[in-house]
UniProtKB/Swiss-Prot annotation:
Top-level taxon of the source organism: Eukaryota
Source organism (scientific name): Drosophila mauritiana
Function of the molecule: This protein is transferred from male to female during mating and may affect egglaying and behavior after mating.
Cross-referenced Pfam families: Acp26Ab (PF05777)
Gene Ontology biological process terms from the UniProt entry: mating behavior
Tissues in which the protein is found: Main cells of the accessory glands of males.
Main subcellular location: secreted
Protein name per its UniProtKB record: Accessory gland-specific peptide 26Ab
Keywords for this protein: Behavior, Secreted, Signal
Signal peptide residue numbers: 1-21
Location of this chain's protein in the cell: Secreted, Extracellular space
Gene Ontology CC terms, in alphabetical order: extracellular region
InterPro entries (UniProt xref): Acp26Ab
Record's keyword annotation contains Secreted: yes
Length: 90
């Protein structure tokens, strides 16, 4: 009788543990880099970029988001846009 009760309790605990949902996963990462230089007596930004990544499973599916921004005082607008597109494709 005692073995039967222990077996029933163990079975209930196993069913309860395996029926729980998986834990929520959330990972975030960010980095920023900047370089400045004095040119013609003025401080100019050679490059300034930041990248943010996050991964979570809030909806039950693993979702990865990526945001990047880039700026420069010495590059043309076309070059800046090209670098921004490359950063957002990574």
């Amino acid at each position: 009788m005692n073995y039967f009760a222990v077996l029933c309790i163990f079975s209930c605990i196993c069913l309860w543990q395996f029926s729980d949902a998986a834990p929520f996963i959330s990972v975030q990462s960010s980095s920023q880099s900047r370089s400045q230089k004095v040119m013609n007596g003025m401080l100019r930004t050679l490059y300034d970029y930041s990248v943010q990544d996050s991964v979570n499973d809030a909806t039950g599916h693993l979702i990865h988001t990526h945001k990047a921004d880039f700026n420069s005082d010495v590059m043309s607008p076309e070059e800046i846009e090209r670098v921004r597109q490359q950063l957002n494709m990574a």
